């Protein structure tokens, strides 16, 4: 990080899942400016955040379904794959999370986010396959996935169509 004059974001993932003490050492590097969680370990992320305070910008990066957990510990930014296909849904997640409306947020997650994330966990790499398929369903360029990833099956394509139809009915998509 010190070799670059650019601001550096630490992206904590399975292979780089830092302890609070390690995070503190990384935060001492002057150009480390942000921390993105990709582990979905809210407990650890909260401990790191409590230890470092406002020294860094904090980003939730484990998925739209993690908005309730991230917002509960004070994170107000997250990466959203749903925003690429249904930006209104992503904005609504943020609005409800920021407002602290847990009941409405959880209902929105259960109705419109959890079904997508359940499908995305069926196979390794399905995060990409599912989103590319939805893009194609919407007439956008999703394109084929690159090996070793695989395309969704026909039955899973039908599941995705049902999810997209639900988003349309809830006015999260203008198609």
Model regions and ranges:
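Catalytic alpha/beta core domains of metabolic enzymes, predominantly
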Residues: 3-6, 14-113, 120-123
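Conserved short secondary-structure transition element at the edge of the structured enzyme core
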Residues: 71-74, 113-149
């Amino acid at each position: 990080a010190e070799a670059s004059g650019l601001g550096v974001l630490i992206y904590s993932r399975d292979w780089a899942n830092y302890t609070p003490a390690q995070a503190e050492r990384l935060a001492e590097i002057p150009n480390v400016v942000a921390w993105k969680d990709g582990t979905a370990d809210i407990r650890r992320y909260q401990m790191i955040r409590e230890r470092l305070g406002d020294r860094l910008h904090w980003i939730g990066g484990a998925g739209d379904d993690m908005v309730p957990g991230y917002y509960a510990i004070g994170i107000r930014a997250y990466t959203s794959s749903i925003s690429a296909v249904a930006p209104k849904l992503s904005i609504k997640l943020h609005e409800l999370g920021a407002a602290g409306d847990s009941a409405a947020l959880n209902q929105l997650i259960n109705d419109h986010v959890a079904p997508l994330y359940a499908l995305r966990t069926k196979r390794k790499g399905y995060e990409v396959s599912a989103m590319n398929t939805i893009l194609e369903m919407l007439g956008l360029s999703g394109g084929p996935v690159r090996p070793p990833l695989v395309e969704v099956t026909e039955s899973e394509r039908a599941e995705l169509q049902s999810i997209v139809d639900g988003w349309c009915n809830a006015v999260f998509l203008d198609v």
